[in-house]
Amino acid sequence: MFNKHSVEIDWGGRPLKLETGKIARQADGAVVATYGETVVLATVVAAKAPREGVDFLPLTVDYQEKTYAAGRIPGGYFKREGRPTEKETLVSRLIDRPIRPLFVDGWRNETQVIATVLSHDMENDPDIVALVASSAALTLSGAPFKGPIGAARVGFVNDEYVLNPTLDEMVDTQLDLVVAGTADAVLMVESEAKELNEDIMLGAVMFGHRHFQPVINAIIELAEKAAKEPREVTVIDNAALEKEMLGLVEQELRAAYAIPVKQDRYAAVGKVKEKVIAHYFPEGQEPKYDKLRIAGVFKELEAKIVRWNILDTGKRIDGRDSKTVRNIIAEVGVLPRAHGSALFTRGETQAMVVTTLGTGEDEQYIDALSGTYKETFLLHYNFPPYSVGETGRLGGTKRREIGHGKLAWRAIHPVLPPHHEFPYTIRVVSEITESNGSSSMASVCGASLALMDAGVPLKRPTAGIAMGLILEDKRFAVLSDILGDEDHLGDMDFKVAGTESGITSLQMDIKIEGITEEIMKVALGQAKDGRIHILGEMAKALTNARAELGEYAPRIETFKIPTDKIREVIGTGGKVIREIVEKTGAKVNIEDDGTVKVASSDGEAMKAAIKWIKSIASEPEVGQIYDGTVVKVMEFGAFVNFFGSKDGLVHISQLASARVQKTSDVVKEGDKVKVKLLGFDDRGKTRLSMKVVDQTTGEDLEAKDKVAEGEKAPREAAGE
């Protein structure tokens, strides 16, 4: 019944098995990849006919984690998986980025890749397994895919690279780098690093590339057994049409791409397009070509003119040479009520970045496949349509926004202070107010400034830069701080973020094969020069974190109480802690180990809350005087609440120095009194006294009498 085929190899000391022919047999391609005991099913289905009216590759990649893979049931009312989590979105992009450039030009059939995590062994992260499985499924599917690709995760521990570190090993690594590519070239890199230098980062990329070669060979071996016949793609020869169009508009198009201002340039290019449309689609005549074909050829001309100009003259669209960074203006403290804020402008790209400091109540609860945890650093990236002069629908967060936000998060995360030293929940929001390339790196620069403006003690300021590449035969140009057009028309998008000491984040997407180690080395070196320049411009606004937190930011005090006192501080059903919060206005968070965090922007409120909590958690001392409140009046005395939640009895004989007939003659419920702790009776009940305390000044009358007697005794002994 099953026509099974499988290949198994040892990869990094663990077995990797690829199997097809048993599960999801109606998909064009389906592979179950097993690494250790982590299992991922990847399927590929491509439509039989091209999608009408599109001039792009209609590819969709979906990565999904099933909670049963970890032996768990989803939370929530419905008890089933909901919308994609942040990790699912990020891994979907991680798979999409290296496979998209490898489809044959002209493939317009709807293609969907679905990677489903079926089992997770809590050691091997499913993302790499999903990438490998997706590559294998595409290779078997018959889709025009110029793969296969391999992928690997690289760690760096004790000055040595580690292949596919386990989740436990990731705790100690200085590097988390994912690299994917073909047998000959690297296509994608995604990483976070603890300020590592360029040589270590490049070495990690090449280490990963070498070590995923056995995976590529295994996929090829499986394809030889089970691959479908490749589907044909009709490729139209546009050489003659391109030559004709070039003769028609070359001069105008070159002139348009010499205009440095984006909106003016787009207007000029628009007029050239109108000329092309008027020429090829004259009114009243049957057109010779369809509009998509003309638009595609025009786009090719745009790319060639921009690329030739850069390689031939060294001049870019806006007149810069390949290494120059656009003009930068950095400002901090731009929003009066925000805890920290910055406006970072680089050419026609601008980010307004805002930092908000919160408490433990604001931590994000993450219910991940590998377990639940709390996230104390959040970075959100928003890209509204007005930033590029367009209208658009505002709605849910898009995949691109999630991806760019995570890239900026990775750049900043390594320089944050440890949470035990700076016990705040930190949220950074980057609002892209203008965009013409490199908005994610503007977010990194703005985030660094906004955090320092808020008083967050970063290890060092952090900056980011986006690099591009133009490669024609053996000629190439690496471009610093690319524009949006240079991103679209170039061969590489290479984002590098870090401090003056090293790289904290590296993301690379390459659209062509043939990027050599030499080119990557040049790009990294040029990126370092650009990063140092940008850090210098940022320093004109702020060089280090402010000594004090923002005026409106909460202050947090941390202290410990005995664990057996936690229940008393919280109270039945949270009654006591709610009262503390309501009456003082401070926020209180108590952890299982007895760590208490009290937060408030009002210093007096914080002091009151701390005093209240400590009074509950501490034990009163015999002989000390305390403020109290009469809570109950009885015939034999009064019960007084003191020292937080403690209650004690003032016997009728201890109410006043004179004889008291009725307790109510001296006190009534609600009276504020001063009491001295005399001790405890045989049953452990607290004994208090009012008569030995001056109810006005709080002075200990008993102690005063003893002092007086002590002074009197020597005089009597002398015969006075």
Curated annotation (Swiss-Prot):
Residue ranges, compositional bias (Basic and acidic residues): 701-720
KH domain span: 554-613
PROSITE patterns tied to this protein: KH_TYPE_1, S1
GO BP terms, alphabetized: mRNA catabolic process; RNA catabolic process; RNA processing
Family recorded in the similarity comment: Belongs to the polyribonucleotide nucleotidyltransferase family.
Residue span(s) of domain S1 motif: 623-691
SMART domains: KH, S1
Chain spans, region Disordered: 699-720
Protein name: Polyribonucleotide nucleotidyltransferase
Entry keywords, A to Z: Cytoplasm, Magnesium, Metal-binding, Nucleotidyltransferase, RNA-binding, Transferase
Any single Gene Ontology cellular-component annotation: cytosol
The protein's Enzyme Commission number: 2.7.7.8
A Pfam family recorded for this sequence: PNPase
Cofactor(s), names only, from the UniProt record: Mg(2+)
Function: Involved in mRNA degradation. Catalyzes the phosphorolysis of single-stranded polyribonucleotides processively in the 3'- to 5'-direction.
Gene (name only): pnp
Residues the entry annotates as binding Mg(2+): D487, D493
